[in-house]
Design a protein with these regions (language model features):
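Repeat-blade elements of multi-bladed beta-propeller folds
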Residues: 220, 325-326, 372-377, 423
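Surface-exposed loops/turns
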Residues: 322, 371, 384, 416, ...
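Carboxylate-rich, polar loop motifs that coordinate divalent cations or form catalytic acidic clusters
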Residues: 1-361, 397, 428
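Glycine-centered coil/turn sites that cap beta-strands in beta-rich domains
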Residues: 357-389, 407-410
């Protein structure tokens, strides 16, 4: 009998969009090309839980293909929404290796509430995001109602956005903490819509002209909101930052984006951060630091203000399979960073996790630290920017640091770079105001 060897991996190298869900990873392998048309991908859906990959073949979804986004259901466990660049939306129930279709969402099943492209039955649902009220917003491009929403009760509605949005080829979408919906328009800037009580109120288009966005280019490729509410925008000609997005809907207020410049000499001839790199994706980690995935030059990792490059990954200096980065996703629980390239997925153990609201579940790992272990000691469950001081039982401080988001890392060495002696060590932890405190014990065995 022939031997069939099936690797524990995604079924193919296609990784158009990656989505994390409480430690689980979903991969949408479909996509669209540079002019925004379907690529007719039939790879299905890939799912990573723990160390095991499960591949759900496209045959499970009938004619549904070009799956470009997976979004976890916000309230129903093991349910996801899958969006297709051609066939609308599916709500799916996942049970191990089996999957069942709960419902299809398209023009026919919503009695016309979700219009298709020119009444053809084609729906290119490019992206989804969740607001604070449990509404899932989605892009419905090339229609007269390009902004759609799935309400918590399952009702589907789509909205027109005035002249700026009529027929717009809207792709990526983001809901901000300030109640705005941002939609990338292919080669035509960004639509920003203000929500009130879950209903669109007004829409403004941001472009490359001064006074209406002043973007480096109207070919916007991505955007991300950081922990300070600032919007980082990637275009085919570099990076821009909108520091006060609330100004967009305020009369007589500027909402032009800023180009970040590093001018070390102060002579006014500084260099733009990331230059004119085409930036396909931006992700913000638990420490508010920025990951930039470029179209041809790998990955850049910077500090929170973007002006200091911390790391650079490329095909030549790292395990990246390609310098063409399609998507970046961060597992906020572990700090693991996933890079989707045109040649497959690569993961990297980052240092930052999402900060906790309280420190009720602080722990160290590994603990005890066994003889021969030389890796990092992780202290997790911390609030953002927690102060950590590690002492021996006599109270001598051997190490101190500030948490990266919700995690602090100790290499098991003292201030002189020497490995500490065997014994019990105490990690004294406090928030940045010194109000909330916690203590963790770490046993070192040499």
């Amino acid at each position: 009998f022939p031997l069939e060897v099936v690797p524990n991996s995604p079924a193919t190298r296609n990784a158009f969009r990656i989505q994390q869900d409480e430690g689980r990873i979903w991969v949408a392998p479909g996509g669209y090309d540079v002019v925004g048309t379907p690529v007719f991908n039939n790879d299905g859906i890939f799912h990573l839980e723990g160390l095991n990959w499960t591949n759900y073949p496209n045959a499970l979804f009938g004619s549904f293909k070009d799956i470009v986004e997976i979004f976890p259901h916000p309230t129903v466990e093991n349910h996801i929404y899958a969006s297709s660049f051609g066939s609308g939306l599916l709500e799916l129930a996942i049970d191990g290796e089996s999957v069942s279709i709960v419902r299809e969402i398209n023009e026919a099943t919503t009695d016309g509430a979700m219009p298709s492209i020119s009444g053809s039955g084609e729906h290119r649902v490019a992206d989804m995001d969740l607001d604070a009220d449990g509404n899932i917003w989605f892009s419905n491009p090339l229609t007269d109602r390009p902004l759609g929403v799935i309400r918590p009760d399952g009702t589907v509605e789509c909205y027109g956005l005035g002249a700026a949005g009529a027929g717009a080829n809207v792709l990526k979408l983001m809901v901000t903490s300030g109640g705005q919906v941002w939609q990338q328009i292919r080669n035509n800037g960004i639509l920003v819509t203000r929500l009130e009580d879950g209903v669109p109120q007004e829409t403004v288009r941001l472009g490359a002209s001064e006074g209406s966005g002043d973007l480096p280019s109207e070919s916007v490729l991505c955007f991300a909101e950081d922990q300070d509410g600032e919007i980082w925008i990637g275009t085919n000609e570099g990076l821009a930052v909108l520091f006060s997005p609330e100004n967009i809907f305020e009369p007589n207020r500027s909402y032009d984006a800023s180009i970040l410049v590093i001018d070390e000499d102060g002579d006014g001839n500084g260099e733009r951060v990331l230059g004119s790199e085409a930036i396909n994706d931006i992700e913000v980690d638990g420490a508010n630091k920025k990951w930039f995935g470029t179209a041809n030059n790998g990955v850049f990792y910077t500090n929170s203000n973007g002006r200091t490059q911390l790391q650079r990954f490329s095909k030549t200096n790292s395990p990246l399979a390609s310098d063409v980065i399609l998507d970046i996703e961060i597992d906020d629980q572990t700090g693991m960073v996933y890079f989707g390239t045109d040649q497959g997925i690569v993961s990297y153990q980052g240092q930052a996790t999402a900060g906790e609201k309280t420190m009720s579940d602080v722990f160290a790992y590994p603990n005890p630290v066994e003889p021969g272990y030389s890796g990092p000691i992780l202290i997790r469950g911390l609030v953002t920017n927690a102060q950590v001081k590690i002492t021996d039982v006599e109270g001598n401080i051997v190490f101190e640091t500030v948490a990266e988001g919700g995690q602090a890392i100790w290499d098991g060495k003292n201030f002189d770079g020497l490995k500490v002696a065997s014994g019990i060590y105490l990690a004294f932890i406090s928030d940045d105001l010194g109000v909330n405190t916690e203590v963790a014990k770490i046993m070192i065995l040499n």
